[in-house]
Regions:
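Conserved catalytic-core motifs of GNAT/GCN5-like acyltransferases
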Residues: 124, 142-157
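Conserved GNAT acetyl-CoA-binding A-motif
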Residues: 116-127
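GNAT-family acyltransferases
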Residues: 1-90, 115, 152-164
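Loop/helix-junction capping segments adjacent to catalytic residues or to phosphate/diphosphate-binding pockets
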Residues: 11, 85, 102, 130-133
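Conserved acetyl-CoA-binding loop-helix of GNAT-fold acetyltransferases
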Residues: 92-95, 101-114, 134-138
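Conserved active-site alpha-helix within GNAT-family acetyltransferase domains
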Residues: 128-145
């Protein structure tokens, strides 16, 4: 298993990942089913600060890959602003449906903590997502508070995660 920064050479395995995630009902991948390449290019561009929606900061995407299959994806958002600090956090991740419960998210978050982030970051999760809550807490996330996300229409848990 390896964790690598997303690039266009991952297109074929990314298409398979998008399909699996979309079939499982993951919203961000449902819309991308018809054009996985555009989503991959967009994510690669975001890492370089290209094509960012207003208020967004550069965001690098990394894939956890084993035997030519993407098991999970993690995004690390750079910088600080109110939206990152108070709403979505600096890190977002998901695991392929057929790889859930196997420690992939924990592996990715610990890897990012050791290899990518330079400073304290905020990580959030839906209050009902017990698996994500456990992942964050295993990585040393310190619970800060809960809040209602108007954008996502659900209650969110907010954590502080410090580098090693």
């Amino acid at each position: 298993m390896e964790i690598v920064k997303a690039n266009l050479s991952h297109l074929k395995v990314f298409e398979q990942y998008v399909e699996k995630c979309a079939q499982a009902g993951m919203e961000m991948y449902i819309a991308a089913q018809s054009d996985s390449e555009a989503l991959l290019k967009k994510r690669i561009g975001y890492a370089n600060g290209e094509g960012l929606p207003e208020g967004w900061t550069p965001s690098a995407t990394y894939f956890c890959i084993e035997d030519g299959v993407i098991l999970g994806s993690i995004r690390v958002r750079e910088g600080n602003n109110d939206y990152l600090e108070k709403v979505i956090g600096h890190i977002g991740y998901e695991t392929a449906p057929d790889a859930q419960g196997k420690g992939i998210a924990t592996t990715m978050l610990n890897w990012v903590k050791l290899k990518v982030i330079q400073d304290t970051v905020i990580v959030t999760c839906d209050v009902n997502n017990i698996a994500s809550r456990r992942v964050i807490e295993k990585a040393g996330g310190e619970f800060l508070n809960t809040f209602y996300s108007e954008q996502d229409q659900y209650e969110v848990r907010r954590y502080r995660l410090m580098t090693e």
